[in-house]
Amino acid sequence: MAEEQPQVELFVKAGSDGAKIGNCPFSQRLFMVLWLKGVTFNVTTVDTKRRTETVQKLCPGGQLPFLLYGTEVHTDTNKIEEFLEAMLCPPRYPKLAALNPESNTSGLDIFAKFSAYIKNSNPALNDNLEKGLLKALKVLDNYLTSPLPEEVDETSAEDEGISQRKFLDGNELTLADCNLLPKLHIVQVVCKKYRGFTIPEAFRGVHRYLSNAYAREEFASTCPDDEEIELAYEQVARALK
């Protein structure tokens, strides 16, 4: 007889109305992990301005997101992800870890470059900061268009050409995608709204990657509304003057 699954509840940051999902890439990351695991779970949005007594008791520190697994409370996004990967494992649940270590680090500096770009108010620095963001996106594009070791046929003398895989580590979403995609989505929304910047069409690997991701419910349905992201960055994004 199959072991009964413990109750799983993810507590995430609420949006501006105190109810819908707010802007938080860490919350979305864990939301995606649970969805991909195929486990039954609940998501509770927490209004950071009006925390309920239940939330205060469960997590006095108030750090979001946090996970209730049975009666255990888990905090820290990285540790929660490790815990879920260890507890919700094969044969009942899929393994989500990437096979290639490079998949876990590719594109991770994009968010830092984006933050520097969007927080800058000095027009004289704008071009260089934009170039820094473009360079980071180019590194990701190179990784996405380069064949993974398992895509290379060592017996063939022909050049393998451009990878056509859907995601960072292959044709299935992994933990690496759960980490990167929520941040890439924020970059797209915020840069377009506050800088009129869009990811260049020349970065075909990145565009293919995002297109494949938005076609997956686990990503598209866990994204906060664009308005929530724009609102979160309203005070962060500095006007050039």
Swiss-Prot record:
Q: How does it sit in the membrane?
A: Single-pass membrane protein
Q: Which enzyme type, at the first EC level?
A: oxidoreductase
Q: Which residues cross the membrane?
A: 26-46
GO terms in the biological process aspect are: chloride transport; positive regulation of osteoblast differentiation; regulation of mitochondrial membrane potential
Q: Which residues carry this modification: N6-acetyllysine?
A: K13, K119, K131
> Keywords in UniProt for this one?
Acetylation, Cell membrane, Chloride, Chloride channel, Cytoplasm, Disulfide bond, Endoplasmic reticulum, Ion channel, Ion transport, Membrane, Nucleus, Oxidoreductase, Phosphoprotein, Transmembrane, Transmembrane helix, Transport, Voltage-gated channel
Task: Please give the residue positions where the record annotates the modification Phosphotyrosine.
Answer: Y233
As for subcellular location, the record says:
Nucleus; Nucleus membrane; Cytoplasm; Cell membrane
Q: Where is this motif: G-site?
A: 24-27
- State the family it belongs to: Belongs to the chloride channel CLIC family.
Q: In the UniProt entry, what is the domain comment?
A: The active G-site contains a monothiol Cys-X-X-Ser motif which mediates glutathione-dependent redox catalysis. Members of this family may change from a globular, soluble state to a state where the N-terminal domain is inserted into the membrane and functions as a channel. The redox status of the active cysteine in Cys-X-X-Cys/Ser motif likely determines the capacity to adopt a soluble or membrane-inserted state. A conformation change of the N-terminal domain is thought to expose hydrophobic surfaces that trigger membrane insertion.
Q: State the oligomer form and interacting partners.
A: Monomer. Homodimer (in vitro). Interacts with TRAPPC2. Dimerization requires a conformation change that leads to the exposure of a large hydrophobic surface. In vivo, this may lead to membrane insertion. Interacts with AKAP9.
Record-linked NCBIfam families: O-ClC
Q: What is this protein called?
A: Chloride intracellular channel protein 1
The protein's organism comes out as Mus musculus
